[in-house]
Regions:
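Short active-site segment of divalent metal-dependent hydrolases/proteases
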Residues: 26, 51-52, 185, 205
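Acidic, histidine-bearing metal-coordination/catalytic regions of metal-dependent phosphoesterases
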Residues: 1-27, 73
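Conserved beta-sheet core of the metallophosphoesterase superfamily
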Residues: 184-260, 265-266
Length: 274
């Protein structure tokens, strides 16, 4: 697992460092926590799919109806099902890796979190444990931290639609605004709002990367447009911290992303003249 760093120059924002964690999928969080501890971010943004609260296959937003895309989706469904069968055991909500990660992360920095498609069946017990851990779950809500307004929206598979009232209220704030949204494929819609920065995951970097290009992402299909990196200076897409499918990544390392907000451009230092 690597640490990937991006710097966003934004005159309206106070200087701030954000640790972006996506797609943990209940895997062992030790490496993630080590990277965050070393980076010392001001805020940790957890942008979806931390927990596994779904039924295999039903949460795959296929993105397009082409035969190739449908075949890839079918392969992912089978792979996820096999992984679930191998790991099937009685769930203990208070002992899971995802919740362990949240409890430890709050010791490093304030934690804000949004829901992804794998959290479709988040329970009241889950919400209570998340709140007890000190994590702020942003479910069409927002919170101010260090002068920046953080908001979060869930997967449309959780709600069925966008919460227009929240998006309008959130985006109208004069503060610098950071939105947690698991799905980068929502960006064409969300970009119409004056939101300064959107943090996403979901694509797992395109799963297989060839010459830096992701091959497939749920919700976008083959050769996805938004799969990893920074787009338009407003959208950051993480490759995520883990896999759900049994087949491995290729050319696509897992990562924790560190986003630094700077309100000044670097100064150019000219050589002294005599």
């Amino acid at each position: 697992m690597r640490r990937t760093e991006y710097t966003i120059h934004c005159p309206a924002s106070p200087p701030l460092t954000i640790g972006l964690v996506t797609d943990l999928h209940e895997r062992n969080p030790a490496e993630v926590l080590n990277l965050l501890t070393y980076a010392k971010p001001d805020v940790i943004a957890v942008a979806g799919d931390t927990l596994e609260r779904h039924k295999c296959g039903e949460n795959l937003d296929k993105g397009d109806s082409s035969l190739a895309s449908r075949l890839v989706c079918a392969g992912i469904q089978i792979s996820e099902k096999l992984a679930d069968l191998r790991q099937q055991k009685k769930r203990d909500v208070k002992a899971e890796y995802g919740l362990q990660f949240l409890r430890e992360a709050v010791k490093i920095a304030p934690v804000v979190m949004c829901l992804g498609n794998h959290e479709l069946y988040l329970t009241d017990e889950d919400r209570a444990v998340i709140a007890e851990a000190g994590v702020r779950l942003l479910d069409n809500t927002s919170v101010e931290i260090h002068g920046v307004l953080f908001g979060g929206i869930p997967s449309k598979q959780v709600t069925g639609t966008f919460h227009e009232t929240f998006l309008e209220t959130f985006s109208s704030s004069p503060q610098y605004k950071v939105l947690l949204c698991h799905h980068p494929e929502y960006y064409p819609y969300l970009s119409r709002y004056p939101i300064d920065l959107i943090l996403s995951g979901h694509c797992h970097g395109g799963q297989i990367r060839v010459f830096g290009r992701g091959i497939f992402a749920p919700g976008q299909g083959l050769l996805p447009k938004y799969h990893h990196g920074v787009y338009d200076g407003r959208l950051v897409v993480s490759a995520g911290c883990a896999n759900t499918a049994s087949f491995p990544r290729w050319g696509n390392e897992t990562e924790v992303v560190i986003v630094t907000l700077e309100n000044e451009w670097p100064r150019l230092t000219l050589p002294a003249t005599g």
